[in-house]
Amino acid sequence: MRVAILSDIHGNSIALDAVLADIEAQGGVDYFWLLGDYVALGPDPAGVLARLDQLPNTTFIRGNTDRYVAHDERPFPLKDTVLANPELLDRYVNLNSGFAWTKGAVTAVNKLNWLSQLPLEYRTTLPDGTCFLGVHAAPGTDDGFGFKPGMDIAQMADQLADCSADLVMVGHTHQCMDEQVGDVHLINLGSVSNPVGSDLRAKYVILTADETSHTIEPRFVDYDHQAVISQLETIGHPSAAFISQFMRGEM
């Protein structure tokens, strides 16, 4: 079996198209496992959802931003924090406007209910007997600190305690990592969109498994970041300035 595993598309159909073309160029896959954050924040949430609808053999779980959009929750900074720290007001307004805009776009294509019902995690057993867990941030949560390169091993082990899996794949922090933490093989996929750091390519993995073993191939795909910025500006996205920072490698 061959599986493409993606996370953190964030409403970026340009990046998603590049990834899907790369998957096809690698010979295609049998399954798609998607680990959340599909629509916010980015210029084309409806386009992303339309493309995902066309994929065969898909498994979806939720990310924190999917929950924010579906249930009118919001990321940091919250209102009380802004009242105590007025310098955060611009960020607060920018993010809240962006999530409200995204909810409107998702509602317009009748996908809000779908988004609200996504499960927290996906568990399966690979053909070689490996117990797999896919979750957006960390076992038991779609939010929080997540997993980043350079984390203390004890902190990672604490988040993985009692996960009941041999192989755990996550996204959320937009930073790739591959670590053996005790008995658990931990993979952070990075992100399809809104890259953090200097490597602006879209990132995902292809998992190949049979009855004897499995392999994991990280994939890194170029796409046109300026085209994304132009798309944000053309539609007047309320979070255009914030999202463009990712596209320029400023986050």
What are these regions (language model features)?
Residues 1-4, 124-133, 181-185, 214-215:
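Beta-strand-turn-beta hairpins that frame and shape the catalytic cleft
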Residues 1-55, 240:
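N-terminal active-site segment of His-dependent metallophosphoesterases
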Residues 6-7, 32-37, 59-64, 135, ...:
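Active-site neighborhood of phospho(di)ester-bond hydrolases with catalytic His/Asp-centered motifs
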Residues 10-15, 40-43, 65-70, 140, ...:
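Active-site environment of divalent metal-dependent phosphoester hydrolases
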Residues 49, 55-122, 150-159, 163-164:
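Active-site neighborhood of divalent metal-dependent phosphoester bond hydrolases
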Residues 82-83, 130-163, 195:
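Active-site-proximal segments of metal-dependent phosphoesterases and phosphodiesterases across multiple
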Residues 150-187:
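Anionic-ligand binding region
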Residues 167, 179-251:
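Acidic, His/Gly-rich catalytic cores of divalent-metal-dependent hydrolytic chemistry
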